């Protein structure tokens, strides 16, 4: 397979130059191939969300390189990376504008890569296209285009955020615990929608999750992080033969090794 993302010798510190300086990553290496769906698990503070922040451009590394399709994007602005990297956050409120309608949010997202961010008048053809996209959610959102997004439930809003993140032709999708704030039923619904969109559009995806069942059941690769390191990296038959109990055993072993 072709390499999409390569992180080389990356070091990242918080509180640099202060008594509270903390290195999250030190000489960290990581690669992602095109078409992979990588589930990332790990304890709090292991570097999972920091990794997504570095890839999206909301955080710049102290040293090292981030290569995207062999282009060095280490210092590229976040808004420029947003043209080819989509992201869905844990908080459903971050993926859409509450005061705008579903239609207005989708039209805004649709104009993301247009010159000067111009938003053209929405034609009947585009409205039909939006309805087709929303019908995948199986929540009836396609019939509520005039509804203010702020009135939607968390699950509905997160499903909308997923659709919006995939409206333009992105090369990489980042999911940052995107089901964590939802009730169990909504969480399962959004996860099934996630898998459907990724499979149909063949989008390379990194999904940070605390849900070990989702990490085991979904994706083509499973990475476990601890203290800025990848301590497990499973794919193929190795991932297929892994279960939740096996992952919990690894977590327990790590805790014992670290004296926790």
Write out the residue ranges for each language-model feature.
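A short, flexible loop at the N-terminus of ABC-type nucleotide-binding domains that lies
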Residues: 2-4, 13-27, 77
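ABC ATPase NBD coupling module
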Residues: 72-86, 91-94, 116-119, 123, ...
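Conserved beta-strand-loop-alpha-helix hinge in the C-terminal portion
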Residues: 229-253
């Amino acid at each position: 397979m072709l390499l999409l993302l390569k992180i080389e010798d990356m070091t990242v510190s918080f509180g640099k130059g202060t008594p509270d300086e903390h290195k999250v990553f030190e000489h960290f290496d990581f690669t992602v191939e095109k078409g992979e769906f990588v589930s990332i698990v790990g304890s709090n503070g292991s570097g999972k969300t920091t990794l997504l922040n570095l890839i999206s451009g909301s955080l710049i590394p102290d040293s090292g390189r981030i290569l995207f399709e062999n282009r060095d994007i280490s210092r590229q602005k976040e808004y420029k990376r947003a043209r080819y990297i989509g992201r869905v956050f844990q908080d459903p409120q971050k993926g859409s504008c509450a005061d705008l309608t579903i239609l207005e949010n989708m039209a805004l997202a649709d104009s993301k890569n247009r010159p000067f961010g111009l938003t053209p008048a929405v034609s009947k053809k585009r409205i039909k296209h939006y309805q087709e996209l929303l019908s995948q959610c199986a929540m009836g959102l396609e019939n509520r285009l005039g509804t203010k997004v702020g009135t939607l439930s968390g699950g509905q809003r997160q499903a909308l955020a997923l659709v919006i993140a995939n409206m333009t032709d992105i090369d990489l999708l980042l999911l940052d615990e995107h089901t964590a704030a939802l009730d169990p039923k909504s969480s399962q619904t959004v996860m099934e929608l996630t898998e459907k969109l990724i499979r149909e559009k063949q989008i390379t995806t990194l999904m940070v999750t605390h849900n070990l069942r989702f990490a085991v059941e979904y994706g083509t690769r499973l990475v476990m992080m601890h203290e800025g390191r990848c301590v497990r990296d499973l794919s193929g038959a190795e991932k297929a033969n892994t279960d939740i109990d096996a992952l919990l055993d690894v977590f327990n072993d790590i805790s014992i090794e670290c004296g926790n």
